[in-house]
């Protein structure tokens, strides 16, 4: 008996040591980056004079700092209307990421927009669904050239689903481009867009390029595919990811370290979850992707050449200068039909074509489906994904296939090097629709980085798209 106990202990110590070795260099490197960032900002210059106000960012509490920054931002003088090159609706989440979004706007984004003669209306969000409610009810969206978001993917998700509640949602989606300045822990949409144009995937390069595009009068936008999502009690528009199991838990359970570690929180929690690995019983159903003649194409346009309303008007006008009744009816009913795939080429899970449907009921370690290449700056999760393409890149890991916990650690670290899909225990397939049914409790269902309260989630590709700031002329 003693020998058995000793053997078990030695095996446990061996795999724990292996996990620690695998993660140690990565964690040390990321924590070194955090310390260097903290050191670079620790010396107080006390005051910065900007936009008619004085900003001190290190000698008072976060609440006092946010209050003063908000006051300075809202009291700015916009460029004269006759000189204006464009107009943006700006949403700032003061609590996203490490909590520096207000400072970023006051000291960097605002001055650059002023210099470019771009006017802006600022909304500083005060809590969940603030941006959603603004975009759901705002009557003058048409006057803006675009929306600029200082936060992470979560606020983009909230904004899109606010627009989804409007009667003119499917006119607004492609004609109101969204710009992003990374201020949250997760910036998958931005990284996916920038990587297409060769931006290096590190924090400094992503921020610099995002700032350049967001504040440039020659900014261009292009199409990003939109997906239909249905849960137990609500429907959503989605653009990025659906997760359940390991990676969803890492994302949500590390939220408590958001301000102290930033996006490095994922690495630390990844180590913890690899040591304390869980399995989850669920049923996964999916339809393999078949294009069937549908070839998505990207619509690239200048952000400031026209307002949103002008782009909407252009989309209505046909060669004879009128809009057909059938077209208007189609646009009005798209909102009602959003719970179904808006495509003749794809079918919802559970349709009559059962021979093409795959069903897996088992114990899962991880289910993660993405529609874009990146979920963060570390490396592409789905290297073959394209912005405008309407296929879903589904990957999953079964408990019976993983072997040891060390393999999970290798999987998480392999994402950064684009080799995770080559691991033998990782299954991946391109699908047009999928359905997840949660059988056992214990994990979060995460949609575009946000927790959704549901035991069933259905996702389907559509022909709809949004537009996102992507480049400069």
UniProtKB/Swiss-Prot annotation:
Q: What is the effect of changing residue 268 to Q?
A: Disrupts location in axons. Loss of neurotransmission
- Per its UniProt record, what SMART domains does this chain match? DAGKc
For binding ATP, which residues are annotated in this chain's numbering? 93-95, 125-129, 158, 184-186, 258, 265, 448-450
Q: Which reaction does it catalyse?
A: a sphingoid base + ATP = a sphingoid 1-phosphate + ADP + H(+); 15-methylhexadecasphing-4-enine + ATP = 15-methylhexadecasphing-4-enine 1-phosphate + ADP + H(+); 15-methylhexadecasphinganine + ATP = 15-methylhexadecasphinganine 1-phosphate + ADP + H(+)
Q: Which UniProt keywords apply?
A: ATP-binding, Cell membrane, Cell projection, Kinase, Lipid metabolism, Membrane, Mitochondrion, Nucleotide-binding, Sphingolipid metabolism, Synapse, Transferase
Entry-linked PROSITE patterns: DAGK
Where are the active-site residues found? 153
Residues annotated for substrate binding in this entry = 151-154, 251
Gene Ontology CC annotations of this record: axon; cytoplasm; intracellular membrane-bounded organelle; membrane; mitochondrial membrane; mitochondrion; neuronal cell body; nucleus
Instruction: List the GO biological process terms.
Output: lipid phosphorylation; mitochondrial unfolded protein response; positive regulation of acetylcholine secretion, neurotransmission; protein acetylation; regulation of locomotion; regulation of phagocytosis; sphingosine biosynthetic process
S-S pairs? none
Necessary cofactors: Mg(2+)
Q: Where in the cell is it found?
A: Presynaptic cell membrane; Cell projection, Axon; Perikaryon; Mitochondrion membrane
**A Gene Ontology molecular function term of the record:** ATP binding
Q: Which InterPro entries match?
A: ATP-NAD_kinase_N (IPR017438), Diacylglycerol_kinase_cat_dom (IPR001206), Lipid_Phosphate_FormReg (IPR050187), NAD/diacylglycerol_kinase_sf (IPR016064)
Where expressed (tissues)?
Answer: Expressed in the majority of cholinergic and GABAergic neurons, body wall muscle, excretory canal cells, intestine, and hypodermis.
> What Enzyme Commission number(s) does the record list for this chain?
2.7.1.91
**Nucleotide-binding: present as a keyword of the record?**
yes
Instruction: Please list the residue ranges annotated as the DAGKc domain.
Output: 83-233
The pathway it acts in is: Lipid metabolism; sphingolipid metabolism
Free-text function comment from the UniProt entry: Catalyzes the phosphorylation of sphingoid bases to form sphingoid 1-phosphate (SPP), which have both intra- and extracellular functions. C.elegans contain specific sphingoid bases, which are unique or different in structure compared to the sphingoid bases found in other animals. Two examples of these distinctive compounds are: 15-methylhexadecasphinganine and 15-methylhexadecasphing-4-enine. Required for neurotransmitter release from neuromuscular junctions. Acts by recruiting the synaptic vesicle priming protein unc-13 to synapses.
Descriptive protein name: Sphingosine kinase 1
Gene that this polypeptide is encoded by: sphk-1
């Amino acid at each position: 008996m003693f020998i058995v106990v000793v053997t078990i202990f030695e095996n446990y110590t061996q795999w724990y040591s292996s996990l620690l070795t695998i993660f140690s260099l990565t964690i040390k490197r990321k924590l070194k980056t955090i310390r260097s960032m903290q050191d670079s900002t620790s010396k107080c210059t006390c005051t910065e004079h900007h936009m008619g106000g004085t900003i001190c960012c290190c000698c008072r509490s976060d609440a006092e700092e946010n209050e003063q920054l908000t006051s300075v931002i809202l009291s700015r003088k916009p460029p004269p209307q006759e000189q204006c090159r464009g107009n943006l609706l700006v949403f700032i989440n003061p609590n996203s990421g490490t909590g520096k979004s207000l400072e970023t706007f006051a000291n960097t984004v605002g001055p650059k927009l002023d210099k470019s003669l771009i006017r802006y209306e600022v909304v500083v969000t005060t809590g969940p669904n603030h941006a959603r409610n603004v975009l759901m009810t705002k009557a003058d969206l048409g006057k803006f050239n675009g929306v600029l978001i200082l936060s992470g993917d979560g606020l983009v998700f909230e904004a899109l689903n606010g627009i989804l509640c409007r009667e003119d949602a499917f006119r607004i989606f492609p004609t109101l481009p969204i710009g992003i300045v990374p201020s949250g822990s997760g910036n998958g949409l931005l990284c996916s867009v920038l990587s297409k144009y060769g931006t290096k995937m590190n924090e400094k390069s992503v921020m610099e390029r995002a700032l350049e595009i967001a504040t440039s009068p020659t900014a261009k936008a292009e199409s990003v595919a939109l997906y239909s999502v249905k849960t137990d009690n609500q429907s959503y528009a989605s653009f990025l990811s659906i997760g359940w199991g390991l990676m969803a838990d890492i994302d949500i359970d590390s939220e408590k370290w958001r301000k102290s570690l930033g996006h490095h929180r994922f690495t630390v929690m990844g180590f913890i979850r690899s040591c304390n690995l869980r399995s989850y019983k669920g049923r996964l159903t999916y339809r393999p992707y078949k294009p069937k003649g549908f070839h998505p194409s990207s619509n690239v346009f200048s952000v400031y050449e026209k307002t949103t309303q002008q782009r909407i008007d252009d989309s209505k006008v046909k060669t004879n200068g009128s809009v057909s009744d059938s077209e208007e009816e189609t646009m009005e009913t798209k909102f009602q039909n959003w719970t179904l795939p808006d495509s003749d080429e794809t079918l919802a899970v559970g349709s009559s074509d059962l021979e093409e449907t795959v069903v897996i009921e088992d114990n899962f370690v991880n289910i993660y489906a993405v529609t874009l290449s990146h979920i963060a700056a570390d490396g592409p999760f789905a290297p073959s994904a394209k912005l405008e393409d309407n296929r879903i890149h589904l990957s999953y890991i079964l408990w019976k296939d993983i072997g040891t916990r060390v393999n999970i650690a290798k999987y998480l670290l392999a994402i950064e090097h684009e080799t995770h899909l080559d691991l033998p225990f990782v299954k991946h397939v391109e699908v047009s629709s999928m359905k997840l049914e949660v059988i056992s409790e214990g994990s979060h269902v995460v949609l575009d980085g946000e927790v959704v309260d549901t035991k069933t989630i259905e996702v389907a590709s559509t022909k709809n798209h949004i537009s996102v700031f992507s480049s400069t002329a």
